[in-house]
Amino acid sequence: MNRRKLMASLAVIPAIGLATPVFAQEEPLKVGFIYVGPVGDGGWTYQHDLGRQAIEEEFGDRVETTFIESVPEGADAERALSQLALAGNELIFATSFGFMDPVINVAAKFPDVKFEHATGYKRAENVATYDARFYEGRAVMGTIAGRMTESNKIGYIGSFPIPEVIQGINSSFIHARKVNPDVEMKVVWAYSWFDPAKEADAASALIAEGVDVILQHTDSTAPLAKAQEAGAIGFGQASDMSNFAPSPRVSSIIDNWAPYYIERVGQVLDGTWESKGTWAGIAGGEVEIGEITEAVPAEVKEEALALKDSIASGEYHPFTGPLNRQDGSEWLAEGQVATDEELSGMNFFVEGITAKIPE
Amino acid sequence: MIDPLSVFLLLLSASTPIVFAALGELVTERAGVLNLGVEGMMIVGALAGFAAAHATGSPFIGFVVAALAGAAVSMTFAMLTQFLLANQVASGLALTLFGLGLAALFGKPLEGIKAPAMVPGPLRINWIVWLGIAMVPLIWWFLNRSRAGLILRGVGENHDAAHALGYPVRIVRITAIGFGGAMAGVGGAFLSIAIVLQWTEGMTAGAGWIALAIVVFSNWTALGVLAGAWLFGGVTVLQLRLQAAGVAVPVQFLSMAPYLATIIVLVLISAQQKYSRRSGRAAPGSLGQNFYALR
Amino acid sequence: MWIFPAMVLAGALGGWAWGMIPAMLRNWFGASEILVSLMLVYVAQKVAAWMAFGPMKNPEGFGFPGSRNLQQYPAASNPELIAGTGAHWGVVAAALAVLATWFLISRHIRGFHIRAAGLAPRAARFAGVRPETLVAFCLGLSGACAGMAGLFEVSGPAGQITDSFGSGYGFTAIIVAFLGRLHPVGILLAGLLLALTYIGGELAQLTLQLPAATVQVFQGMLLFFLLGFDLLTRFRLQRRITA
């Protein structure tokens, strides 16, 4: 650590206990982050931290970023958020769903501090929310999966039965079916975002069921390692996982928070920030498709990229009718597109998936 | 339908980290020491093993280094409990905290690197899996048929008596703690080198705690550890297999079941010992108690 | 008005009942209370997870796991008593618990029995102390305390039951008890010390940009030293004179 930083850190200490930041004009904008995992998790938190680094790179001396990592959801989160606010951060990013209520509570106590909460649905005057349309990426994965499977069985390792994951399962299934009407989808729930041993077991269970393409919604590389052993293929999740390329990792779905973070910090700097809910996808650069490797035939790659482009241009929505619910009742009529409200509360599988969502 | 053999083969490899860690803890506990730091030793082993395997390109050297690292970090616990007479439960918890932090700190440069490939052994199953299974009869033999094992059990049952008979209680216990650390280290390294093929912070994700439960379930026998590891691992593997086959399963209840089974086993064995005064063993007599020679 | 006190009572009762499981298994069958309660930790976690995904799931929560947030129901919440301090009713209750435990252990005959049974079980038995009663009393009481601690968290800072509720506070409490040398006031101080390392750890991340792992290592080492040097307070070092 250099001397300037040390001085800066000493300067913070007297500021603790004051609710409002002092000298906001002269000083660089302080941006705080609270992470649910360690920055070294190679997945969710790692990607958010890349976003933080992108802010520093973009704005240089005009911003100063700090983070607190591995904060458990629940009681500890509120304390950590208060500390970030007390330390003079004017913009705070809370990057896990479980931080939702703590953010709302702390935001009420610090009306001058702006909060950004990832993946939640509660907003306030000074609390904005943001999320990424991961299902758009899943549509591309589903297309590749449907084309690549030889056993016509694809597997999905779910973390928790929440709307984001259910969207992902539906989206990948719909698009796999579109290119391969015989495809079947097997779903297992790991009940964890990160548990390598269990994820490996989940992948093995799918492989033993005859699955040869695995989509994962959990963050470790264990399913890819299992896929490699069994000669199956899979996709990187959250981060690129490119060290498993070209096979078993044939592509990946990457969370890229940098564009959003840079945009929002810029808005705070020029005074145009306001609370809103942002749900961007491939078009906004939030959801990236990692390089499709040579293990995928060229025409499949082309088809996948074409789908990606049509989603990016807004020409195509992955949830476009006709689509029925699992029980056969009609959900979307021909040409009808799912609304964001429907998607953000999604709690059913589409027709054709045989697995049940656990109650 | 679900083919039992495939479930079993899956189970063999899935339960290996826990088999190692639990066998190590078994020996430690039979010497009368309750080390709750298994999770911490496992993750240190996972990191050290991965680092060594990556640096040398040899998974085998990785496992050796993991064993050494696990044993080394367990010596802090040995120091505290055997020389400084600190409480074993608290020291073990501190060891877990320390190990998790230490591994995370030193693991930073290794993030995102892939482990070197391993040559599979018989039945396309990793050699380490077979080694874990081979350790079961070896440890059984050591505990029940060898003189050294007899002394170790004596120390664990009644350290005052063992001391009076002239056995070096402290040395026996330190050795047992070190062995437990080495085994936990290998178990952790199996996760990073053979299952995930990558180092990630916090990758043991509670495996050490399961190993502790299995030792209780095993009624402190080597064969029981294997049965316990297969039961605990089996429940997970089976519920995932059922899910994959499209059967709805009550996951929370299923994953609770092995722990309830452990309590029932513990109660049955204790009751047998209490009321019949014959056979049946429960926890080693001096488990968790510190020893100091009065003279 | 009465809802929150009733919740505290129910929390204590729940903790007491959970604590009585190892106590009774110990008394009836001689099963080790350490091991039984260790196993019960996992069972309790699964029960909480089941509740968060099942019966207690917030119907307005868009399918996310977790109960309704109690902070939005003033009658059932445990708010900050003094704004900005984070102090809630749990702080008051903890202070009272320290006093009550001190009185129990140092001034009450039952506390004397507990200490006697801890130091010399056989002697205590001869003096007419029934170990079964003590086991049930102590485990039940500590269960009730732990239950209240959980309730104050769930109704206060955490606000809701989630699948990850708990995050290791119970194990930290064991460390605190030993650091406090099993004395109520010592435990209060040890609790404050550990809390300081948590908060200080976050501050260190913020101001010095240390990774969380450094803080964890520091905590581990702090505990090692404190536990290790406890020896010097309990034993006197003596130079052995060899003739």
Where are these regions (language model features)?
Chain A
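A residue-level marker of the well-folded mature domains of exported/periplasmic proteins
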Residues: 24-359
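N-terminal signal peptide c-region/cleavage motif recognized by signal peptidases
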Residues: 19-21
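N-terminal secretory signal peptides and thylakoid transit peptides that target proteins
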Residues: 1-11
